[in-house]
From Swiss-Prot:
The modification N6-acetyllysine is found at residue 609. Residues 111-144, 228-248, 273-322 have a biased composition (Acidic residues). It holds the Pfam family Mpp10. The modification Phosphoserine is found at residues 61, 120, 140, 164, 168, 172, 244, 247, 277, 346. GO terms for biological process: ribosomal small subunit biogenesis; rRNA processing. Belongs to the MPP10 family. The lineage of its organism: Eukaryota, Metazoa, Chordata, Craniata, Vertebrata. Part of the small subunit (SSU) processome, composed of more than 70 proteins and the RNA chaperone small nucleolar RNA (snoRNA) U3. Component of a heterotrimeric complex containing IMP3, IMP4 and MPHOSPH10. Interacts with IMP3 and IMP4. This is U3 small nucleolar ribonucleoprotein protein MPP10. It comes from Mus musculus (Mouse). PANTHER family: U3 SMALL NUCLEOLAR RIBONUCLEOPROTEIN PROTEIN MPP10. Residues 577-599 have a biased composition (Basic residues). Component of the 60-80S U3 small nucleolar ribonucleoprotein (U3 snoRNP). Required for the early cleavages during pre-18S ribosomal RNA processing. Part of the small subunit (SSU) processome, first precursor of the small eukaryotic ribosomal subunit. During the assembly of the SSU processome in the nucleolus, many ribosome biogenesis factors, an RNA chaperone and ribosomal proteins associate with the nascent pre-rRNA and work in concert to generate RNA folding, modifications, rearrangements and cleavage as well as targeted degradation of pre-ribosomal RNA by the RNA exosome.
Length: 681
């Protein structure tokens, strides 16, 4: 009994906690951290409890305990999924096997009112059994004996033949809707219907294709039947009087099996097959309405009760009336075709409905086309001013720049972070200044900057050669220096006298004239706004360095030769200019070399003479050996003044060429002719 008591206590404790939480639903409007921790602990208790009672047939999660310490909600859910998935699969397989088995019937056949009475008695007995079990468990825990009267009551209940099969404690908790289970099995067994063409007569309830298939099925069944059965059916006398028991059993036997469910729970689905499309179902519900459905259900329930309770004669009459009413209700439900104005059953309307049924590819294409159209529209529409590049104040709306977050470069160094070291350093400086009694403000020490010269006041360099001599240039520079000194050394007394005279003349002018003559206008100093365009709009921050406000030409000098170009960018003129520049530099180098030689000759004249003599001797030796030939200047390059001189010169050149061609032949002959005197015997 201990494990049963343990089970009951754990389940009661869990239910108590859940009831406490659900009694106050308004608490769930805010975050309940304590409640969340309680629920996690409850899930752990239930999980561990389930693992203890788990049979070997159902193998759930391999984890014997639910781990919740240092685990988040997602990880706990994953542990529960590991346990639930195989269990659900097991139950699904078991249910499908029982549904497929034709020998098993979910609803046992009962006879008339006895079945209902038995069912109510069984429920009452089950409740009494549960109460007695609870009392026995409590007594067994306390150590007391169970009374014998209760045992007898138990045995009498067990021996009751009308009682339904006994269920265990675990089975008693199961409560499921049989009607839903039947519908699920029908939907599973029902094969997927092939899409058929709609006819003109088709309605929400009536379909021509279904009628044709039903007739074909009936014909096939009739063909399969043997001849003996047909004769037996023909021999039955339909006008015979039938006993009340037989009539009740025969007429309402089938109805009892189906109407074993409570008549209050009967719905449209219990009388008619479900409509294939969801739209048709919703249409039927809307047409009937909740009031009509209730009336029909009550009508059917009343018919069933009256048919069971009344006599045979009354039964016959009521059967006729009920059949008429039933037929009328069926006619009203099944054949209540809509008006021609409400729904158009023409072939054009059917075609439109068939066109509406599109394939997945067509739907994808439609979505793609819509997306392309929207993107094209975005591209063609006018873009906002933020995406239009450089926009001036006139082109954008007023005060629109204030609503945007602008990104710009800070040229000023950020202030240092104040730490303990900086504060201590400041304290030391303050103490030192108090000792030195230096109460004046500290002069800011700045790094000396080279002021960027103004671009507009830049001196233009003159590339022409100066016509003045060096002496004249020095003279002008000297005169300028002397003039500056004389200007600086003005007599201070003269300056004072000039000021006094100016003030006197002003007073005299005021006395001599009717009205006061103002002071003469002093020439104002004009400030040239040589700044970038961004400062004119007053968008730039106040603390920006001067370097950021100057143009690049003001900061760095422009190259004299212009912008740098690559070899591919250079034109013919640029290449010629470079060539001239190289030649000029080469000439300068040669001139410098000659100057150095001359200086050396001047400094060492003896060395230069000896070098010249050595060079001349070397030349003579080379000419003697025949390695070098000296060219004499015979004034050949002198211009010819007459035609006679020209032709004579031409003749001489031809003769020289002929002689040069004959010389190698003579040398060969000399080498070949060997005299006898040179040979020794």
């Amino acid at each position: 009994m201990a494990p049963r008591v343990f089970r009951r206590q754990t389940l009661e404790r869990c239910l108590r906690e859940i009831r406490k939480a659900t009694n106050r639903p308004e608490c769930f409007l805010t975050i309940q951290n304590g409640l969340a921790s309680n629920f996690t602990s409850l899930t752990k208790v239930l999980y561990d409890f389930n693992k203890v009672l788990e049979n070997g047939r159902i193998s759930g999660s391999p984890l014997q305990k639910l781990e919740i310490n240092s685990f988040d909600d997602e990880q706990i859910w994953q542990q529960l999924e590991l346990q639930n998935e195989p269990v659900l699969q097991y139950f699904q397989n078991a249910v499908s096997e029982t549904v497929e088995d034709e020998d098993i019937s979910l609803l046992p056949e009962c006879e008339d009112e006895e079945c209902e009475e038995d069912a109510s008695e069984v429920e009452a007995d089950n409740q009494e059994n549960l109460e007695t079990d609870l009392d026995e468990e409590q007594l067994s825990d306390e150590g007391g004996d169970v009374p014998k009267g209760r045992d007898r009551a138990k045995s009498s209940r067990k021996s009751d033949p009308r009682k339904s099969p006994v269920f265990s404690d675990e089975d008693s908790d199961l409560d499921f809707d049989i009607g839903k289970l039947e519908q699920q099995t029908k939907m599973q067994i029902k094969p997927p219907g092939k899409p058929r063409e709609k006819s003109v007569v088709d309605d929400k309830f009536f379909k021509l294709s279904e009628m044709e298939s039903f007739l074909e099925k009936v014909e096939k069944e009739e063909e399969k039947r043997p001849d003996g059965e047909e004769e037996d059916e023909e021999d039955i006398d339909l006008f015979e009087d039938i006993d009340s028991d037989e009539s009740e059993g025969g007429l309402f036997g089938r109805q009892k099996i189906k109407s074993n469910k409570s008549s209050r729970n009967l719905k449209y689905k219990d009388f008619f097959d479900p409509v294939e499309s969801d739209e048709d179902i919703t249409g039927v519900d809307e047409e009937l309405g909740p009031d009509e459905e209730k009336e029909e259900e009550e009508g059917f329930a009343e018919e069933a009760d009256e048919s069971i309770s009344d006599t045979d004669e009354d039964n016959d009459l009521e059967e006729d009336e009920n059949s008429d009413q039933h037929k009328g209700s069926l006619k009203r439900v099944t054949f209540a075709l809509p008006d021609d104005e409400a729904e158009d059953t023409s072939p054009l309307a059917v075609k439109q409905e068939s066109d509406e049924v599109k394939s997945s590819f067509e739907k994808r294409q439609e979505k793609m086309n819509e997306k392309i159209a929207s993107l094209e529209k975005e591209l063609l529409d006018k873009k906002p001013w933020q995406l239009q590049g450089e926009v001036t104040a006139q082109k954008r709306p007023e005060n629109s720049l204030l609503e945007e977050t602008l990104h710009f470069d800070h040229a000023v160094r950020m202030a240092p972070v104040i730490t303990e070291e900086t504060t201590l350093h400041l304290e030391d400086i303050i103490k030192q200044r108090i000792r030195d009694q230096a109460w004046d403000d500290v002069e800011r020490k700045e790094k000396p900057k080279e002021d960027a010269y103004e671009y507009k006041k830049r001196l233009t360099l003159d590339h022409e050669k100066s016509k003045l001599s060096l002496a004249e240039i020095y003279e002008q520079e000297y005169l300028k220096l002397n003039q500056q000194k004389t200007e600086e050394e003005d007599n201070p007394e003269h300056v004072e006298i000039q000021k006094m005279m100016d003030s006197l003349f002003l007073k005299l002018d005021a006395l001599s004239n009717f009205h006061f003559i103002p002071k003469p206008p002093v020439p104002e100093i004009k400030v040239v706004s040589n700044l970038p365009a961004i400062t004119m709009e007053e968008v730039a921050p106040v603390s920006v360095s001067d370097a950021a406000l100057l143009a690049p030409e003001e900061i760095k000098e422009k190259n004299k030769a212009g912008d740098l170009k690559t070899a591919a960018e250079k034109t013919a003129t640029d290449k010629k200019r470079e060539r001239r520049k190289k030649k000029y530099q080469k000439r300068l180098k040669i001139k410098e070399k000659e100057k150095r030689k001359k200086l050396l000759e001047k400094n060492n004249p003896d060395q230069s003479k000896s070098s010249r003599a050595a060079a001349s001797e070397k030349l003579k030796q080379l000419t003697k050996t025949g390695k070098v030939s000296l060219l004499k200047d015979e004034r050949k390059d002198k211009p010819l003044k007459s035609s006679q001189a020209f032709f004579s010169k031409l003749q001489d050149q031809v003769k020289m060429q002929i002689n040069d061609a004959k010389q190698p032949e003579k040398i060969k002959k000399k080498k070949q002719d060997i005299s006898v005197h040179k040979l020794k015997l």
